[in-house]
Design a protein with these regions (language model features):
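LRR flanking "cap" motifs
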Residues: 38-94, 384-388, 403, 410-411
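C-terminal capping segment of individual leucine-rich repeats
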Residues: 101, 125, 135, 149, ...
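The feature encodes a structural signal of leucine-rich repeats
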Residues: 92-100, 119-121, 140-145, 164-169, ...
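Surface-exposed cap/linker segments adjacent to membranes
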Residues: 2-65
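Membrane-proximal ectodomain caps of single-pass cell-surface receptors
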Residues: 30, 79, 223, 242-247, ...
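Consensus "Asn ladder" position of solenoid repeat domains
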Residues: 113, 134-137, 158-161, 182-185, ...
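A generic tandem-repeat structural signature
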Residues: 97-215
Length: 414
């Protein structure tokens, strides 16, 4: 026994020297990975692979971008390719299938660069992976379906690449999956049923079509949902019960019908619904909890370029950045909006291109410098001189709407 204890350090030392402490399989995988990628920069100062010297005694402590398990043979547990520094152009080349030999890997990260080719199918054999983040490169092909079988996957970020194909239905089985970011690719097909405890879903700027998953199939835990810039359609009633949402972006799709009143609440502090085909009114603040619609600093609501009608209610007064332009709102704007603009709480209020008849501002009150207000092309002569308004170029030069378009909404007309 004593003999064994004395020998043990020696054995460990010998195997460490022989294998450089690191598993030989992992070491040869790292070699393959390096051989298939290159630094775009030629300056060794901000190059990533400078430290990857395969004659070094302990790659686990000297290679940039890897961490290893403690015990010998050490296994690579996280791999981060690229420096991630803003002055580094990143890597070029392809992702070697040899990554799949790093069987203890829990995190795989590739920073911004111009890496091309597909995501190796074999990645799906790395059962311990919990984070896959391969963003801002030029990866092509479809997302390997094997990724959607990884039992420990928590975060999948493949945004800003050129990925095609569809999102497989097996994604719904991944109960550990919390964060899915596939934005800015060319992914098509429909949005499948999602994992029940998903927190963050970004599918923006793809080629998705069809409707959102049915109401009872939406993850109630969702806090962040963006599907902006796709070809999605159908009603928004499926979102009614998502009470945890703080960020919602459905802009630039073909959604129609009314906006569920449950989405008008201050905890949903960023809501982008612009450029759809939404109809109906902005609801009244709920009588039971009017405080639920007291929006704070940083809040943004964009309902522009829809077909919303009726008179504005107090619900959105106080939103810091508020776009209501290019709808069919009528009547007088409630005083609370005007007060919020003149107190500087609302910093942007776009109301142009509606059928609004009155913006009840007190004569001579100076507009705070920080405020961008646009009231043109409504059924009134704006009470604020054109030179004091901050209208976007797209608002056009006309101060008011032609009278013949307004007669139907002119309540003061006999
Ligand atoms: C994984 O490692 C084995 C043994 O070193 C090797 O034969 C095989 O080619 C490797 N796999 C890949 C995908 O590189
Ligand atoms: C928008 O909605 C209206 C009325 O529901 C419908 O007639 C029209 O076709 C829709 N437009 C688009 C682009 O979906
Ligand atoms: C609304 O009707 C009144 C009374 O006929 C008229 O004086 C006013 O110019 C009209 N306003 C607009 C914007 O058409």
């Amino acid at each position: 026994m004593r003999m064994f204890l004395l020998l043990l350090p020696l054995v460990l030392l010998l195997s460490a020297v022989e294998t450089q402490g690191i598993s030989v399989v992992d070491l040869s995988a790292l070699r393959e990975i390096k051989n298939s990628l290159t630094d775009i920069t030629s300056s060794s100062l901000n190059a990533f692979f400078t430290s990857w010297d395969f004659t070094a005694p302990d790659p686990c402590s000297s290679f940039a971008g890897i961490t290893c398990s403690l015990f010998i043979p050490k296994r690579v547990t996280t791999l981060t390719l690229g420096t991630g520094l803003s002055d580094s152009p990143g890597l070029a080349g392809i992702l070697s299938p040899a990554i799949s030999n790093l069987s203890e890997l829990t995190q795989l990260v590739l920073f911004t660069g111009i890496v091309t080719g597909p995501i190796p199918d074999q990645i799906g054999t790395l059962k311990k992976l919990s984070v896959i983040s391969l963003t801002n490169n030029r990866l092509t092909g479809s997302i390997p379906t094997s990724i959607f079988t990884l039992p420990n996957l928590h975060t999948l970020d493949l945004s800003h690449n050129q990925l095609t194909g569809t999102i497989p239905g097996s994604i719904s089985e991944l109960s550990s999956l919390k964060v899915v970011v596939l934005g800015s690719n060319k992914i098509s097909g429909e949005i499948p049923i999602l994992p029940t405890e998903l927190l963050h879903l970004d599918l923006s700027n793809n080629e998705l079509s069809g409707m959102l998953p049915r109401k009872n199939r939406m993850p109630l835990t969702l806090r962040y949902l963006s599907v902006s810039g796709n070809r999605l359609w159908g009603p928004l009633s499926v979102l009614e019960s998502l009470s945890e949402l703080v960020y919602l972006d459905l802009s630039m799709n073909r959604f129609s019908g009314t906006i569920p009143s449950s989405l008008f609440r201050s905890t949903l502090s960023s809501m982008y619904l612009q450029r759809n085909n939404l109809t109906g009114r902005v609801p009244q603040p709920p009588l039971t909890s009017p405080a639920a619609t007291v929006y704070g600093p940083g809040s943004t609501v964009d309902l522009s370029h829809n077909s919303l009608t009726g008179e504005l209610t107090n619900t959105l007064a106080g939103v810091e950045t508020l776009f209501l332009n290019n709808n069919r709102f009528t009547g007088a704007v409630p005083k609370d909006y005007v007060e919020s603009v003149y107190s500087g709480n609302t910093r942007t209020l776009y109301l142009q291109h509606n059928y609004i008849a009155e913006f009840p501002v007190k004569e001579g009150l100076p507009l705070p410098d920080s405020v961008a207000l646009c009231l043109t092309y409504n059924c009134m002569v704006p009470p604020v001189p054109l030179g004091f308004m901050a209208c976007p170029v797209s608002a056009g030069g006309q101060i008011s709407r032609p009278v013949n378009q307004c007669s139907a909404f002119n309540t003061s007309m006999a």
